[in-house]
Amino acid sequence: MGKINIKKGDLVQVITGAKAERGGDRGKQGKVLRVFTESNRVLVEGINRVTKHTKVGQSQRGSKTGGIEIVEAPIHISNVALVDPSTKKTTRVGYRLETVERDGRERVTRVRFAKSSGKDLA
């Protein structure tokens, strides 16, 4: 697959899957918690929540662990789109080169920007 334009901390929206009225996540927005580059998946806060059954055991401190937990599962990167922070709508990502003066030297850095509004992304 191509380049991954989504980074940790970005706001994304689910663009495919079951509609929210039917219990799905399409149209929902959330913050990216982690990016799995090897499998082209992202972990999004509050999206793709699944029930996980863990075996009962003891932690290092002696407290009981295990039971039924609801956790987020990774979702494929092609199923989400980046949200422009200024317009709150989905957008594509572009890159531009900017010269920044740091420590008395000029350095060229790549800056991500939202193609819909042209504003820089964090």
From Swiss-Prot:
The lineage of its organism: Bacteria, Bacillati, Actinomycetota, Actinomycetes, Micrococcales. One of its GO terms (cellular component) is ribosome. It comes from the Bacteria. Keywords: Ribonucleoprotein, Ribosomal protein, RNA-binding, rRNA-binding. InterPro entries: Rib_uL2_dom2, Ribosomal_uL24, Ribosomal_uL24_KOW, Translation_prot_SH3-like_sf. This is Large ribosomal subunit protein uL24. Pfam families: ribosomal_L24. Part of the 50S ribosomal subunit. Belongs to the universal ribosomal protein uL24 family. One of two assembly initiator proteins, it binds directly to the 5'-end of the 23S rRNA, where it nucleates assembly of the 50S subunit. It comes from Renibacterium salmoninarum (strain ATCC 33209 / DSM 20767 / JCM 11484 / NBRC 15589 / NCIMB 2235). GO terms for biological process: translation. One of its GO terms (molecular function) is structural constituent of ribosome. CDD domains: KOW_RPL26.
